[in-house]
Amino acid sequence: MKNFAEKFLDENPDLEKVEFIYVDFNGIPRGKNASPKTLIKASKGGLKMPISSYVLDVWGDNPKGTGLVMSGDGDAICRVVENSLAITPWSSRKNAQCLVSMEDGDGNPIYADPRHILSTVLKRFEELELKPVIAPEMEFYLIDQKLQKNGHPQMPLIPGTNRRYEEVQLLNLNEMDDFEGFFDLVEKSARLLGIPAETAIKECAPGQFEINLLHHDDALLMADQAFLMKRSIKNSAKKFNLNATFMAKPFSEHAGNGMH
């Protein structure tokens, strides 16, 4: 009987690449790009990556004190999160992506895996007969890919003009329409990735928007979906020569971004 990886490859014979992704302590996606055949290898526990990469700092350096690098920088087995395997619609070729979690040779989760840490917290909720219900609201700015001369970000140009967005315009549908192609791609991405994206609105600053996910009571799944939604937004923006930033305060004079 074929497993999920073999079935996925049968359904997508023209697949060109698979991205194996895990999230480090800072929310940065790390992993490998590999040939489609590697998916079968990964589904059987044959894909490995270094444990130390979970605790890299935001500059990608190994922080002192973890002991992971000096002890040999060992690898761990990467297990595919099956329900995360999907085609990526923002790719120029037919590519797929999936999340992975790391475990040791005995099947025990790696202590530094954020998914494992969250699972441990959720077990404590279960002991209290509680179940958290999560519905993230994700705020972000769409900005020009070109920075100002001083290195600061700048608003994108209003389509068909040489002017940049300046007005707050909360809930303005005209500004949403200006980025219709971007939001269509984000919606398509959410649908293909199984992300319960519910609404998108214009937020309280020029070029600022919010996408809400529909609430449910599987907190680990919601954490996966929120990460994948953020990645989808960033990659979709690049297709329209924009950058999406979730930075807390990219503009000192405008409202900050939050996730609540």
Predicted features along the sequence, with ranges:
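Short, conserved phosphate-binding/catalytic loop or strand-edge motifs used
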Residues: 138, 203-211
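Acidic, glycine-rich loop-and-beta core segments that form the ion-binding/anion-interacting portion
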Residues: 208, 213, 219-260
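Short secondary-structure boundary/hinge segments and terminal tails
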Residues: 60, 142-143, 207-208, 254-255
